[in-house]
Amino acid sequence: MLVTGIVCPVALVFILLADRLALSTAALVAAAAIAGAFAPPVTVLTRTVWRYRFDDPAERKTAFALDAVLIELAFTLGPVLVAVLLAVASPRVAFTAALLLVALAVPVFALSPALKYWRHQPGVERRLLGPLADPRLLAVYAVTFLLMFALGLLEIGYAGFATAAAMPAFAGILIAINSIGSGTGGLLYGGAQLAMPVERQLPRLLLLVVLPLAAHTVTGSPWLLAALALVAGIGIAPALTVVMLLISANAPSRYATEAFTWSTTFLVGGLGAGHALGGRIVEGYGARAVFGVAAGAAAAAAISALAVRQRKLAPVDR
């Protein structure tokens, strides 16, 4: 954690000063790669702390739901802050603000009183593949990848739709509306008392994402699409909350941190893959095709979630 808190900000400083240091393109790419590779794993460690901190299932669900809502809030407010700084200042100022936030992340986390709940697992047997050797966790990771793949496609689809409608700024609005829907759904889910086991909730929550995504393919109205974006978001944060609950329940204590780390890997990997494929599809076939593939990916996630539902969950190791 300490290493990432130093290396990542330093790499970002090199990027910030690239022109003054006369860095080559290769050096700039290397600095960006290092910054990404050493990104502080604050979210991973936070979710691990939640696992240890909350024994009560209802409290743990609320914690993970709040985590999902805060992630949505960050993804919504971050671009807005950048846009404002770009409008009133310069790209350098916007990048500096991002750098400062990254630099503050590790100290703030390290000083958090929540760390007193952290548990070390000394002298335990570990396997090479760790959590990847557990079929229950692999099923959850597959759902995570497919859902985030769908969301990556969705973001590109919004950009393509807005560009085709000669309303390029509308893409950011659609993404923000979708995030608002997700945050609202996360808050509602966190406060709900549901008797249904979480593994059975997951396919149903994903279905709430699939249906409005499918409706994206048949509308050409920006305002109707905005309404569908809101509805499509409602199931996202609850679904991600359930994913984290399932990882928390299935991961042995010796692999708790690794399990959430791999979850983040599949999450980011799915999002990036969706962006990459979405860009190719939107150029050749348009936004509606991207929305269709996104709906298909979300449907695949819902079907994959049935395998998670049928497995008996292991208790959390203490």
Residue ranges and their predicted role:
Residues 40-54, 158, 238-251:
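Intracellular juxtamembrane helix-capping segments at the cytosolic ends
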Residues 33-73:
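Cytoplasmic helix-loop-helix junction between adjacent transmembrane helices
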Residues 86, 184-198, 282:
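Helix-to-loop junctions at the C-terminal end of transmembrane segments
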Residues 131-175:
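Helix-loop boundary and gating motifs at the non-cytosolic
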Residues 254-285:
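A late C-terminal transmembrane helix in Major Facilitator Superfamily
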Residues 199-243:
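C-terminal transmembrane helical hairpin of 12-TM major facilitator-type secondary transporters
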Residues 24-42, 145, 225-238:
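Hydrophobic core of transmembrane alpha-helices in multi-pass small-molecule transporters
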Residues 7-22, 208-220:
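C-terminal ends and interior cores of transmembrane alpha-helices
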